Each structure stands twice: as structure tokens, then as C-alpha cells.
Amino acid sequence: MAASCVALLVLALLLLVLLLGLWKRGRQTGRARHMVVVVLGDVGRSPRMQYHALSLAQSGFSVTLLGFYNSKPRDELLQNDRIRIVKLTDLRGLGAGPRILQYGVKVVFQAVYLLWKMMRMDPAAYIFLQNPPGLPAIAVCWFVGCICGSKLVIDWHNYGYSIMGLVHGPRHPIVLLAKWYEKFFGRLSHLNLCVTNAMREDLAENWCVRAVTLYDKPASFFKETPLDLQHELFMKLSHTYSPFQSCSDPSHPDTERSAFTERDCQSGVVRRLHGRPALLVSSTSWTEDEDFSILLRALEKFEQQALTGDSLPSLVCVITGKGPLREHYRHLISQKHLQHVRFCTPWLEAEDYPLLLGSADLGVCLHMSSSGLDLPMKVVDMFGCHLPVCAVNFKCLHELVRHGENGLVFKDAEELAAQLQMLFSKFPDPAGKLSQFRKKLQESGQQRWDESWQHTVLPLLAHSQMTPRPHPPCGHPSCRGF
């Protein structure tokens, strides 16, 4: 009896959705100029989808952006009259029952909730969806598109099942189910974007999905930070984080000092302190695909070299970001008692993060792709700020970092430690390797996001209006299952 009631309720809900969809499908007015951007994650920590929304708005479209609102997005997004943010609610506190049951309940809740939210919106020409996370968003967005006449655009950042595999193992039933789901529904999209050529080739060969590579590019606000703004940022952070505080009082009462800079309050002139520490920056989502023990071991080796009297500076190591393993690594950091290295693990405001990168001396990236097919956006942002980078190696990193040309690549803590010692030797040396890398980045004239998006995505939208189906039938064996 209970099962029959549930079935009738589901059928009634589907009928209601279908009737609403048919009514909305008839409302053609404004659809061609309306776009929906969906991220089943924190909008504030999804910069690429924020960039999509901004680029669409700058191209004259009205945009509805759906996502969780755990972190504040950029002001440019919030202040844009063409962009409306619809906040999604995450289901939390499912502490009872087996984990697989909790996961199933969460997926069902998200599917129904996302469907309800999207059906209440005005019809859109395109639905832009970030994947991962794509469960259950790909199926829901495809279903809404079928009912309302919208075309689905999937932006493949990685494979969701490969991230799940880091936690559960690659042969876990949930992981295999997620892979099947991702492959099946991923083929139903009208357009596909991806972040590397390696992923584009993998999608074509193994999934029969045709995608266009849209590399991550730095937004215009990622640039070198002027010295006066560096000082303001350091003073702001010094109120909360002791590594930014000056170790000594200024000699004059009209002087304002941070750990790196000082400002004459009368003249307003800012200068870098002689003997200042070097500022090393890394950003992370604190997940299993980034092993920060590599950096910690490398810094311990750096400390040993500094204690022997080598011409190495002290370091302030700033690791920004939020994520599930943050407290684990903060505990490990608290057990390190280093004389020449100080740690700081802040979560920065969206506007302060580019300023920090533009003020730093070196960036370190520990991202190791779960699929081996995506690239770390943090390195893109660092390059936009002309910040030299040391990055841990994986399969397609060469599409972004070219060892010895625009950065350095390492495989373990020993190699990273050697690179840190080489780069910071006689710091700050204008003729040193660190300065040479920065100069190369300054001269590279790299493309920015707006230019890349206008050149790559906008023509696809215009062409797709005349192309009903981009995926022809495929007979490749890999497209018939796992």
C-alpha cells in the first residue's frame, strides 16, 4: 500500500512537471537571450562557472546562476544587473543509516530539488553545467532541456567517478555506477567543453563525446599587485594572521610595517623591507588529489639547509582554501616547529586572492589529477600574476607547465626541496632564476579568459542554433558500456 502511494505521488509529480514544461516550452519570448549556468557546488569556489556567467552577461545575455552559496562570489558577479543568482540548499546532517543509503537519499533529494528549482525559472536557450559534480545534475539538466526546449552544454572539468575512486577505490560498485551514469548521460548533451586536449581526445575515443577545448585562462584581475596594494593587503592580513606581522617595531612612529613592507605615513611611500622573508603561496581544495605532505617534507629539508648557513631567506608559506582534509593538514603543520618557515592557512575573500598571488614570490601546486586529464586552475591564475610556479608532475601537465621555460616540475619532496633551495638562493637576487622565470612570464603575453571565451564559446552558441544534434551515432565498442 505504501509503495503504491509513493508510486502515485511520483507519477503525479512527473505529470505536473510535464504540464509545466509544455506551458513553458510555448513561452518563446526572451528564451534566445536567457542562459542558465548550473554548478551543484559552491558558487564562490567555482571560478570557471562564474567566468562563464560574466562572459555570457557581457555578450548581452541574461543569466541565471544556480549553485550553493557557501562562499561569496566576486563583486563583478554580484553587481551585474544581467546576472541573477538562485541559491541552492545542500542536504546536511544525514548521520543515520549506512553511508550508501545516505548517499542515495542525498542524490534523490538533490534531483527533485534541482528539478523543482529549474522548472520554476524562465525558459533558457542553453543550460551550462559544470561536471563534476554531475550526479544527479547531468540527468536533471538534460530532462529540463527536453521539456523546456533548452540545449545542454557540459563543461568537463574532470570525471566525477575518478574523484570518487580516490575515496572508495576504482572497482567499488558506487564508482562503477557513477562511471556508467556519467558516460550515458554525458553523451546526451548538445555541446561539450573541456579543459585539456588530453580530455578532449579521451572523451572522443572512450565516451564518443565530441568536445571543444576551452583552456582555463586568467581573468583580467589576475595581475601583479602594485607595492602600495601589497602593503595594504599585508597590513589587513596581519590583524588576523601572525606571519604577516612585523617581527620588529619601526624606527619611526610615523612608519607602518608588515612582515614584508613598510610605509611612511607622511609621504605614503612604500618599500620592501631589507632581509624580508620570501612569500610562498599554494591554494587547495584540501582533497585526496593533493598531497601536502610533499610540501611539508620539502620545507623541512629547506629548513635544514637554512640552518647550515646557506644564503637562504626565511619563508612565509600561505596555503589558502577550504576542504575536507584542511584540519588534518593543519594538525600536521602544528606539529612542525621550524625556525625559518612560518605557516598560514587562511580562507581569503574573493577580491584578496588575486592580490595575494600578485604579491607572492613563488607558487607551489600539488594538484595531481584523479583522471590525469585536467589541469590546475591555480597555476593559470599564478601565471596571470606573473608568479613563477613549481608544480607536481602528472600526465598532461605539459599542456600548461613547461619545465625550465615557464616553471619547474617535480615528482617528490626531494626534487621540490632542491628547487626551493635553487630558486631562493641569495634571495632577492634580480639576476637569479626566480627573477628570470618572472621576466619570461611578463614577456609571454598570455591570452586572458574574455578573449579566449569570445573566440571559442560564442561562435559555438551561434552555430549550435542551426545544429540540432552534434553527436552522430557511434559504433565504437567503448561507447556500448564500460
From Swiss-Prot:
GO cellular component, one term: cytoplasmic side of endoplasmic reticulum membrane
Enzyme Commission number(s) from the entry: 2.4.1.142
Main location per the UniProt record: endoplasmic reticulum
Signal peptide (residue range): none
UniProt pathway annotation: Protein modification; protein glycosylation
Modification Phosphoserine, positions: 242
GO biological process, one term: dolichol-linked oligosaccharide biosynthetic process
GO MF: chitobiosyldiphosphodolichol beta-mannosyltransferase activity
Subcellular location as annotated: Endoplasmic reticulum membrane
Annotated keywords: Endoplasmic reticulum, Glycosyltransferase, Membrane, Phosphoprotein, Signal-anchor, Transferase, Transmembrane, Transmembrane helix
Intramembrane stretches (start-end): 100-120
Its membrane topology: Single-pass membrane protein
InterPro entries to which the protein is assigned, alphabetical: ALG1-like
Topological domain spans for side Cytoplasmic: 24-99, 121-482
Top enzyme category: transferase
Keyword Kinase included in the entry's annotation: no
Segments traversing the membrane: 3-23
Keyword check for Plastid: no
Intervals, Lumenal compartment: 1-2
Reaction(s) catalysed (UniProt annotation): an N,N'-diacetylchitobiosyl-diphospho-di-trans,poly-cis-dolichol + GDP-alpha-D-mannose = a beta-D-Man-(1->4)-beta-D-GlcNAc-(1->4)-alpha-D-GlcNAc-diphospho-di-trans,poly-cis-dolichol + GDP + H(+)
Function noted in UniProt: Mannosyltransferase that operates in the biosynthetic pathway of dolichol-linked oligosaccharides, the glycan precursors employed in protein asparagine (N)-glycosylation. The assembly of dolichol-linked oligosaccharides begins on the cytosolic side of the endoplasmic reticulum membrane and finishes in its lumen. The sequential addition of sugars to dolichol pyrophosphate produces dolichol-linked oligosaccharides containing fourteen sugars, including two GlcNAcs, nine mannoses and three glucoses.
Entry similarity comment: Belongs to the glycosyltransferase group 1 family. Glycosyltransferase 33 subfamily.
This protein's name: Chitobiosyldiphosphodolichol beta-mannosyltransferase
Species of provenance: Mus musculus
